[in-house]
Amino acid sequence: MPFITIKTSGKALGPAEIQTLHQETTALMAEVMGKKAEVTAVLVEDAPASHWSVGGRALAGSGGVTAHADIKITQGTNTATEKAAMIAATRDMLLRVLPDLSTVAYVVIDEIPATDWSYGGLTQAERKRRADAA
């Protein structure tokens, strides 16, 4: 049940680009991280360039394009190799959608303890406990 937020700034994304980010991110989570596509959520948000700064300077007026992808997964469910591959693949995907992407763009994988987030009202720890008991 991964949740991925992709924030972009410096270029307004059209519906096709947003759909590409939704579909490709979901596919990468399945192929690279082994996550179920049907429970992978992706939120794409656009931040005004005046709200985003790099080096203390607002992106507005600089012509720069940047992004931040925050991938939330359950702690301990992926290896360091899988996470490194996902970070690289996500960066490549962002470059395909945003060819002028700055090097100052980030992909972060947050590992959330199974006791600290839920899907369908049950924590991941409780889901595992119930599955193990069945």
Model feature map: region roles:
Residues 1-134:
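A domain-level signal for the structural core that forms small-molecule/cofactor-binding pockets
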